[in-house]
């Protein structure tokens, strides 16, 4: 019903689709008298109106219908879910395309592939068209990954929808001591609706992961940094210890009086009850 909802809402007359899968959107478009153009990695698509194409292969052009479409719909595979397989299971890889099966990729590689597909589909659309992408949340081996938070957003974000999902793997499992677990069962998917405002501009937002030492962060305060050092160390800590931990770090380079700033911050933390002043120039982290 998701494709039908958006066809009605945006008065779609020509729907394009990446990751056409079992042909549900094709069937909906046929029933609603909407022109359909779809592609899928499957060498033997289940519907005659779905073309075989590897969206990750930039030597292959998208079908002409993408350039006329009012909307493109994407419901990509969910990378790194071990219990679901497409190539070699739901369909046979007769042309050596399994390497592009996003389902078999790790999360980071899979999301890069999905974002590449998103940009390719967006680039083909005429101005004023919409790109709709349905993605999920993944919990695997104790890690929670949000596809939505890692999704590229080209053009203008029109709206976000939250869709109830009634057959998630998370919802079918019984977890030991579920009531005391910090996790809730995953029973939803996310839908991004994106509008292409112009024909020439490619404007997009893509999440980027940063990793750095807090001592080199320009956004961390002296209090943040001193507390991080204290929490990461054991026993009684001297002022000289904090000097050594911070000497040469970016936080100290912009302050010629950084040692005095460290002493001031240590005193403030002791007054706040976060550190204990145990002697002259000696400090200890107070565990809770």
Q: What is the predicted role of each segment?
A:
Residues 1-288:
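Class I S-adenosyl-L-methionine-dependent methyltransferase catalytic core
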